[in-house]
Amino acid sequence: NGAGEKLALIETNDEMEEADAVVNALEKEIKLQKRNFSDFAILYRTNSQSRSLEDAFRRSGIPYNIVGGFRFYERKEIKDLIGYLSLIVNPKDTISLRRVINFPPRGIGMKTVDKCVIQAAKKKMEMVEVLSIPEDMGIRGKQADSLMTFYNIIKKYNELLPKLNAGELVRALVEETGIIRYFRESSAPEDQERFANVMEFLKGVDEFMIRTPDGGLSQYLEEVSLLTDLDQWNDETNRVTLMTLHSSKGLEFPVVFITGLEDGLFPLYSALESVEKLEEERRLFYVGLTRAMKKVYLMYANHRRRIGSDELYGMVSRFVYEMPEDKLEKISFTSALTRKVVGGRPGIFTKTAVSRT
């Protein structure tokens, strides 16, 4: 931080409000301190945390870059999920069909897909309809069963479109297709991150339902499409930087936000029972603090669902309260988006004393 300037500690209700608070503080810094978007870095412990931040930035028209990874909606597992949803809304979407017909793996190879393409052209049928008659293509046994299962899932959820809202439909779909089970049961480290991203995607759908209680799947897909299209209009160089704390090593920015400062998230739960791992997390927190040339914002939420359960974090990170009290200025924030109050009036920051309770 600048000489004598305290670190801002911002309390929010949940991750939606946390992202909204970042946008609010960032816009205030730009207006009052005449900063550029490129002056800011938003740091987080795990990649899946970027989703709520990206959504808030896109809605506010704030350009950003992801360092050391893909933007949330460009990650393969998320594109696969959106492919499923697009196919359910429009079963004639052959591009989405080819993308997801063997996701999760169900033994449908490219040769089988090619047979379906040829059969659809020959019979002048939609490709999705061909899946229901595998015997006409000489496909039998497990592959025939897999094609029929996939066809029945798409047909079932297409017929459920008028009956279920987006949240209900998406949650039922990821369970029935086995997407959640596939990633959760995998021992590969990259699949654990993909599982976290899928669960974060579901949280994004839940947030859409809060904003749009009667919203259907088509409306949700329109919003995702609109938000991702906005990226193409942004200045390539003047962008906010989003990245994990690990990716931030060696970089410096005038203003740094460290988000998700709750025990169990930062430090991670897996580090709480090991002195060595906890010390490594503490060093990572120090790395985050020292990325800032002028100003640091420390962010935490009172409620944040853990991946794969309804359990909440909510305990402020021990790293925050290991810092000298006179170096912190606690700021409660109330989101204009949710209208939830955590001290203060909607849409403003309210300074309060730091308490060690």
PLM-predicted stretches and their roles:
Residues 5, 58-65, 70-104:
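Conserved short internal alpha-helix adjacent to the catalytic or cofactor-binding core
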